[in-house]
Amino acid sequence: MPIGVPKVPYRMPGGQFTDWISIYDRLYRERIIFLGRDVDDEIANQIIAVMLYLDSEDPGKDIYLYINSPGGMVTSGLAIYDTMQHIKSDVVTICVGLAASMGSFLLAAGTKGKRLALPHSRIMIHQPSGGTRGQATDIEIEAREILRIRHQLNQIYANNTNQPLAKIEKDMDRDFFMSAQEAKEYGLIDRVIEERI
């Protein structure tokens, strides 16, 4: 039976009364964002809005993005990525569980030196997938677009990991799983968290 979104007590600074708010709202107040599902337009818009708000509230103060995601839509993930690069605040990315596909892309997109993973996390990279129906010309247009996106993602991964583009292209041809330590050696993250942060 689903338990719904947990609620926790919270008292506004200087406030007299305690109120019950969602755990996610409470985490936002600590500059913590949790991506715990597929990346789609809805969750991307929420994450982008929170990042923009937190950055405007206290520019330059770290924002923490915890990731436990199997991936999702490329366009939605790129929107989050662009926002991470746009804001003044550093984005600390932390893999808890699984960062696969677009989840690993966002993990690697954190501020260099601040990309982390818990010891038993799994990270997976692969090429984007897509499907289309329709006339042959429509399928050809879609195929060209997915190849363009694949090249764009490969270039960003190469930049974020310092791996040669040819290696990224080879490794992303199929599902490529890594442990947290292997992801560190690959350059996707900077540190495996062994102690509390």
Curated annotation (Swiss-Prot):
Organism: Trichormus variabilis (strain ATCC 29413 / PCC 7937) (Anabaena variabilis)
GO BP term (any one): protein quality control for misfolded or incompletely synthesized proteins
SUPFAM superfamilies linked to this entry: ClpP/crotonase
Organism lineage: Bacteria, Bacillati, Cyanobacteriota, Cyanophyceae, Nostocales
Reactions the enzyme catalyzes: Hydrolysis of proteins to small peptides in the presence of ATP and magnesium. alpha-casein is the usual test substrate. In the absence of ATP, only oligopeptides shorter than five residues are hydrolyzed (such as succinyl-Leu-Tyr-|-NHMec, and Leu-Tyr-Leu-|-Tyr-Trp, in which cleavage of the -Tyr-|-Leu- and -Tyr-|-Trp bonds also occurs)
PROSITE patterns: CLP_PROTEASE_HIS, CLP_PROTEASE_SER
Catalytic center residues: 101 (nucleophile), 126
A single Gene Ontology CC term: endopeptidase Clp complex
Protein name as catalogued: ATP-dependent Clp protease proteolytic subunit 2
InterPro entries for the chain: ClpP (IPR001907), ClpP/crotonase-like_dom_sf (IPR029045), ClpP/TepA (IPR023562), ClpP_His_AS (IPR033135), ClpP_Ser_AS (IPR018215)
The enzyme's E.C. designation: 3.4.21.92
Keyword terms, alphabetized: Cytoplasm, Hydrolase, Protease, Serine protease
Subcellular location(s) of the protein: Cytoplasm
GO molecular function: ATP-dependent peptidase activity; ATPase binding; serine-type endopeptidase activity
Function: Cleaves peptides in various proteins in a process that requires ATP hydrolysis. Has a chymotrypsin-like activity. Plays a major role in the degradation of misfolded proteins.
Oligomeric form and interacting partners: Fourteen ClpP subunits assemble into 2 heptameric rings which stack back to back to give a disk-like structure with a central cavity, resembling the structure of eukaryotic proteasomes.
Family, as annotated: Belongs to the peptidase S14 family.
Domain of life: Bacteria
